[in-house]
Amino acid sequence: MIYQLTRFLLLSVSLLFAASGNASEREELHRLLDEHWARAQQEQIFFRTDPDAYRPDGRLAQVDAEARNRRRAFNEEMLGRLAAIDAEGLSGQDRISYQLFRYERQAERESYDYWDHLFPITSLFGYHTYFAHAPANMAFSGLQDYQRYLVSLEDFPRYNREHIALLQQAVDKGYTHYCGSINGYEQTIADQLVEEARQSSLYQPFERIPSTVAAAQRQQLQQQGLALIEKSIIPANRE
């Protein structure tokens, strides 16, 4: 994942170079990197991450105006604190990390001036297909993985409604897709409207619950998964 690779490069300072810069400047930089990573995990939004690498992990991201403004304000805070760091007091990989992190935050700042978030679907893919296809590429090794996944399933209707609101906002503003990019989009939704919950790609993880999970718990997880897909996911996709 691009974001994780970038973070790895940013945090590999002492392993790659013998940094001799100002300790306080270095400490503040690493404090910013840690805080930003923690917030990204909390928000479940990773700037410039390949959407094909999307993996739900508990509560899904908020995509409404309040959340967007919150993330924008946090990014501005990061830029302000970066500006207070004397880059001349950094050396080696620390200076590279500073420059790269600042570039990413400046790019994120500019991204808020565009309206691409109002177009979360096309004829080929969208937030709903990334969500539906993610489980096939996720590792479910224990009970906690399934419990977090159930939280994601339960939260999908809210996540879906917020994206529908974005689409409506685009209509209200007079913004529309180029016809070719949206032609046939309904099929990507129809693919999720299965007759039986067990046919859903979202149920597949419950068919491969590892033996490390007790039999009674496996049955309970399967029942919960079926209920959420039937009563929450499928109705949400019909909206």
Segments and roles (model prediction):
Residues 20:
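Phosphodiester-processing cores and adjacent nucleic acid-binding clamps
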Residues 7-17:
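Bacterial N-terminal signal peptides
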Residues 1-4:
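N-terminal secretory signal peptides that target proteins for export/translocation
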Residues 23-239:
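N-terminal maturation segment of proteins
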